[in-house]
Amino acid sequence: VLLIAFVLFFVFLIIGVPIAFSLGLGSVLAVFTSEKVSAMIIAQRLFSSINSFSLMAIPFFMLSGELMEAGGISRRLVNIAKAFVGHLTGGIGMVDIGTSVLFAGVSGSAAADTAAVGAMLIPSMQRNGYPKGLAAVIQACAGSLGPIIPPSLTMIIYCSLTGLSIGELFMAGFTPGIVIALGIAFVTYLYAKKYNIKGERKATSGEKILALKEGALAIIMPVIIIGGIVSGVFTPTESGAIAVVYALVVGLFIYKEFTVRDIPKIFLKAAAMTGMALLIVAGASIFSWLVAFERLPRTIVSILVGLTANKHLIMILLVLFLLFVGMFIETLSATIIVAPILMPVAAQYGIDPIQFALVMVITLVYAGVTPPVGGVLFITMGIAKAKMREVLGYLPAYLGIIVLIIVLLIFVPQISLWLPRLVF
């Protein structure tokens, strides 16, 4: 049954059927060909998969991100980044990375981060001497910090599938997210030296204070969200609702960047994005059930045990597998498909579930930067008007440093685990 589902899924994917329907249709048709599985499981899984309190956080965070973007958050975050890192070698490239880090704490989505920040800063990078391909790659890699630095929609879905603590996984993403940002900045610095791209004038203390004052309300939002979750004042789902109210009040009454007439359009955009995400969750739920029914995780464990008993080597093998999967399947879908398969495998080897979850999320996110899927990369290429050949020359250096950081996380799990252990 599972083999039929796999084959049908890839056939539908190849002929251009959207991934949510590819997963759902492939699994449904596979169920109908089996005498062992009741068709009732289809309705049960479709309903139960999205009838989840934790998944209610998705529409809330989608909406809060749209409200904050409409409220002029991007411009204010850019001003903060310019004030603090604009003078460094590479100038606007460093500002782009800094802004993406700040925006990641608001959006929780790679596509939202990339589109919002890239639209403003990719043209600026090009005007400051960055080649088209390099500007596109910098923003694609920096924008992909959205699902790693909390809040993260990918992490919320992973935890809803596996039962892990959303708060712990959020905390685990902080330090690796900053380390990856520093890695991206290091490669950007080397390219800036090569192309002789200098920094801007160093901001005065007064200019830094002014930038912080103007953007303070934007920066405070992730502090409220994460602080509330960690302190136990509210759940991740409730934090999403609070984020919506906060973003609405700030954008409508304080920043006054949008009016009441703009709200329906913002809500519709968030609803469309939420619907897409939940359709993928529902479609993948039948597939995930078939994976468990056919005992695929147990089969994988028995194969891997025959290869090695070293958990670090197993992690590296799983990362290679995830890189391959992430190149062909969009990050959210890949997470839903492989999390139920690989988490039991990691548990068999005594790998910390939070560490494994974080490594999986990071690997799938950055595998998704590469062609042929390359969602965020194609967004930035469109903004930069860059061709694929202009991008491919710069991509390996950035992905190389990120893969090194992933390997570091495998061998030094304390990098990701120290903060959740300190807080929880």
Where are these regions (language model features)?
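Alpha-helical transmembrane segments of multi-pass membrane transport proteins
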Residues: V1-F424
